[in-house]
């Protein structure tokens, strides 16, 4: 098992590539694993098949980005695609389907916004920031003006667990970004 972890660390943390490339590798690999595990969990819980399909499609997409970044050394482009997909599509859809403001989703929005500044630079950072602000504003507008479009969680205890889990993951990932 230690050989596998050593190999993963060698792939993620390499001194021959930029810090942006290392962060991209970390985020895309971790995202691939997290979405695949989420897909298996969602399938095991018997939730809607479209949620399972979305998680597996997201895992495949992030895995392909990880592969393309490593293969073609286009880390800036792959990072922009990753952040645009995360902040412009995945997080807003998840916000609408997972409780909106009455969940841990606002913490994920913060993580998505912070990640922009770790991964992007120059015009990509400006474009990513604009995409993120528009997507977040749309979500908050929808939650305020059309709360009926939000799928809320079934109980208050589930909301609290979601907020705690989101806080722990957000803190862990932010610290990990700073470590790399």
Residue spans of the language-model regions?
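Alpha-helical transmembrane segments and their interfaces in multipass membrane proteins
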Residues: 14-17, 36-60, 73-77, 97-103, ...
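N-terminal membrane topogenic signal
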Residues: 13-28
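Generic transmembrane alpha-helix motif of multi-pass integral membrane proteins
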Residues: 63-68, 89-100, 109-124
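Alpha-helical transmembrane segments
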Residues: 25-35, 80-89, 132-133
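Membrane-embedded alpha-helical segments in integral membrane proteins
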Residues: 30-45, 65, 90-91
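Generic alpha-helical transmembrane segments
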Residues: 54-62, 85-89, 107-109
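Short, Lys/Arg-rich, polar N-terminal cytosolic tail immediately upstream
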Residues: 1-17
